[in-house]
Structure formats: C-alpha cells, structure tokens
Swiss-Prot record:
UniProt keyword annotation of Isomerase present: yes
Keyword Cell wall biogenesis/degradation part of the UniProt annotation: no
EC category: isomerase
EC number(s) per entry: 5.4.3.8
Gene Ontology molecular function terms on file: glutamate-1-semialdehyde 2,1-aminomutase activity; pyridoxal phosphate binding; transaminase activity
Entry's family note: Belongs to the class-III pyridoxal-phosphate-dependent aminotransferase family. HemL subfamily.
Residue numbers carrying N6-(pyridoxal phosphate)lysine: 270
Recorded metabolic or biological pathway in which this protein acts: Porphyrin-containing compound metabolism; protoporphyrin-IX biosynthesis; 5-aminolevulinate from L-glutamyl-tRNA(Glu): step 2/2
InterPro entries, per the entry: 4pyrrol_synth_GluAld_NH2Trfase, Aminotrans_3, Aminotrans_3_PPA_site, PyrdxlP-dep_Trfase, PyrdxlP-dep_Trfase_major, PyrdxlP-dep_Trfase_small
Protein's UniProt name: Glutamate-1-semialdehyde 2,1-aminomutase 1
The organism's place on the tree of life at top rank: Bacteria
C-alpha cells in the first residue's frame, strides 16, 4: 500500500517554477483525474517502477505504449550503451539504419521503402505531405477521436490528448487549416461514404488507426477497414495507417498484418524505438519516391536515423522475435480481463472492458464502446477516483479515462493476480462511496 508522495509533491511544486505546467507533455499531469501532483518516477526495471518517495508500482502505463519489453531490458540497454560509446550522432548514413529498415520491411510487407524520423508526430505529418504530393489534392480525412500527434493538421476532433468540416482542438491552429480536414465517426461506413460523395474529389488521403488506441482500445467492425480501402481508393485517394501505437504491439508486424488489410502508407513510432525517440514512415515504392532527394516532397531531420535510436530499435525487434512472446501477452491479458470483470460483478461496479491481446481499456459505463462519442459518454469522475485508488495500491495506470493498460513481456501471473486483488479493493471502496 502506497501512502507517501511527499517528494513527488515537492518536486512538482519546483517543476511548476521552471517547466510549463510542471510537465513536458500534458497527458502526464493529473488534471484529467481530479488534479494533484503527478507521481515522479526515479527508475524502472522489468514490469516495475519506483518513484522518488521509494514506492514500488506494477506498471501498466509502459510510457503510453513503447515499453513492450519492460523497463531497462538488458539486451536493449546494452545496444544503446554500445551505440553511445561509438558516438551518438554522425549526420551521415550508417549500417544500423540500413539493417533496421530491412527488419521493418521484412516484418511489414506493405513497406516497399522506409524513411526514419524522430517521432510518431513527424511520421504522420510527413505521410500527409507525401500523400498530397502524390495525389495533387489537399484535404485529409480522419476519424473522430483518433489522435495522430500534435501537428496543426491533425489537431482536429482529436482523441485522448485534446477531445464537421474541422474545428481546431488547440489554440494556435488556424480555422483555415482545420477546414482542410474532414472528420467522420469510426466504424460508420455510411457516414464515410456520404463524406466521400461530397468531398472525395478533393481528398488526398484518409488517416486510419486500424485498431484505435486513443479513446481506449477499440477494434474495427468486421469488414470496416476493407470498406474504407474500397471507398477511399474509388475516390482516388490514399489510405494512411497510423500504426504508432499498434505496430509490434499485437504481433510481430503491424495491425495491418494482423487484420489482413493493406494501406498505401504507414506511420510508425513508439514500440519500434525500444524506448528511445523514433518515428518512421513507409509504403508503396511509387508513392515513397515522391520524397526528396528522389521527389519534390521535402522532409529532413538532423537526428533522424541516429545510431542510438537505430540500435535500440533493432534490439527491441530482436527481443520481440522470441517464440511465444505474443501468446504470453494474450494469455496474461485474458487473465487480467477475466479478473477485472469478476471484481466488477462482485462489487456491482458498472464497467465495459475492451481488450485485444496485451492491451485493454476499462470504461466506467455499461454501453458498448465502438466510437469516440461512446467513449466520451463514460464516467470520468469515477475513473479519476479509481486511478488514485490503484495508485495507492501500487498499480500505475495512465491518468486518463481514454488510455489503454499495456502489458509488457516482463509482467508475470503473480503481477496479474496482485492487480486483480487491487482492483477488487478499489472497486469495494468505490462501491462504499456511491
């Protein structure tokens, strides 16, 4: 039982004097769970965190997804250390970036060509530019609630970060830019068709999270992604998959490979960096050849393909190639799902739980969650109380009702058993205070 956060509170007070909002990403604040000082972590190992007060946690945040192999995995840390000893940045081509690109192509057959960048935001931003260059069109389509990074064009009806010809979701995004974005509900073919009938001749591409991760884990309805491909291609536009969260999370490869649907372009990030900053994008050869120096679509980056990130990414994928690893994540995910649902029934707490393999989301509602409107119509106040009760139990979750719980390769059955017991105590406390 965690009872002391004195040092975290003091550190946050100091951080507020020097860092905007006291955090370097707004999702790290506790604003969405009732406020207070966010817990500051000092170190991580495997499936566990220790904060600055010395409290230990089972971690299901996994840095919002990238840490699929657990914290400080020895194979990855060794690769990073070796790369750093040889120099962290050259500004030249390296053998590491060629090896890593080949690994990504072998894992994801839709990638004829690849280019490395520094973040998922950059990857998505650049796929949009490439799609516009290839089609000669300007408008972009996306699904409501799906978050594709913080560049201007995609901060429109966004998901877990912020909340129908577009409306900006952030100050500083001009209405003129937002009007280049058409937003439609996820899992709704009819609305997509209507939008394409109206604007399809102006659309360069549609951005798709093939499995949604930013208003919780939401799978596409059977046949939905196939219909997206069909309708968008009929309109002469491209399909871009944002696999920043999903790639290598559910299988060795992308969600596109798991689901058997092929996009024209793909944006990658998170898991492929093994915990270091990274992004990548790729796709069909004829489309990717729009990118400089071969084509007119310019993209560059001083840090892109840096040796440390390349080495970390290679090492991470080498770990993920181990036999039975994804089956273990699915087994533990199923065990956790069953336990949470049993505790909810025992304590008469209304929840809906969405899970795919080693990732899940607990929504405080009885409604089915298959789009952003349904995810919004859940009890955020109840989630905030649950989040803080779990923190007291030594279980670290994301401080948002929209985020997923991520399992890592280092979680054990004992971790899951303890977590289920902690959920039971948290639900009991919530039931007592209804």
């Amino acid at each position: 039982m965690v009872v002391e956060f004195t040092k975290s509170e003091a550190l946050h007070k100091e951080a507020l004097e020097h860092i905007v909002g006291g955090v370097n990403s707004p999702s790290r604040s506790f604003k969405a769970v009732g406020g207070g000082a966010p817990v500051a972590m000092e170190r991580g190992k495997g499936a566990y965190f220790w904060d600055v007060d010395g409290n230990k946690y089972i971690d299901y945040l996994a840095a919002y997804g990238p840490i699929i192999t657990g914290h400080a995995h020895p194979h990855i840390t060794k690769a990073i250390t070796t790369a750093a000893e040889n120099g962290v940045l050259y500004g030249t081509p390296t053998a590491l970036e060629v090896k890593f690109a080949k690994m990504l192509k072998e894992a994801m057959p839709a990638l004829d060509k690849v280019r490395f960048v520094n973040s998922g935001t950059e990857a998505v931003m650049t796929t949009i530019r490439v799609a516009r260059a290839y089609t000669g069109r300007t408008k972009i389509m996306k699904f409501a609630g799906c978050y594709h990074g913080h560049s201007d064009l995609v901060l429109v009806a966004a998901g877990s970060g912020p909340s129908t010809l577009g409306t900006p979701d952030s100050a500083g995004v001009p209405q003129s830019i937002a009007q280049e974005v058409i937003t439609v509900p996820f899992n709704n073919v009819e609305t997509l068709k209507e939008a394409l009938d109206k604007w399809g001749h102006e659309v360069a591409a549609i951005l798709v999270e093939p499995i949604v991760g930013n208003f919780g884990i939401v799978e596409p309805k059977p046949g939905f992604l196939e219909k997206v491909n069909e309708l968008v291609h009929e309109a002469g536009a491209l399909v871009i998959y944002d696999e920043v969260i999903t790639a290598f999370r559910f299988m060795y490869g992308g969600a596109q490979d798991l689901l058997g649907v092929t996009p024209d372009l793909t944006a990658l990030g998170k898991v492929i960096g093994g915990g270091l900053p990274i992004g990548a994008y790729g796709g069909k050869k004829e489309i990717m050849e729009q990118v400089a120096p071969l084509g007119p679509a310019y993209q560059a980056g001083t840090m892109a393909g840096n040796p440390a990130s390349m080495a970390s990414g290679i090492a991470c994928l080498e770990v993920l190639q181990q036999e039975g690893l994804y089956e273990k994540l699915d087994e533990l995910g199923a065990m956790l799902e069953k336990g949470i649902l049993e505790q909810a029934a025992k304590h008469n707490i209304d929840i809906t739980l969405n899970r795919l393999k080693g990732a899940l989301t607990v929504y405080f509602t009885t409604n089915t969650i298959e789009n952003y409107d349904a995810a919004q119509d859940t009890d955020g106040e109840m989630f905030g109380k649950f989040f803080k009760l779990m923190l007291q139990e030594g279980v670290n979750l994301a401080p948002s009702k929209y985020e997923a719980w991520f399992l890592t390769t280092e979680h054990t059955k004992e971790d899951i058993e303890y977590t289920i017991e902690a959920v039971g105590r948290a639900f009991a406390a919530l039931a007592d205070n209804k």
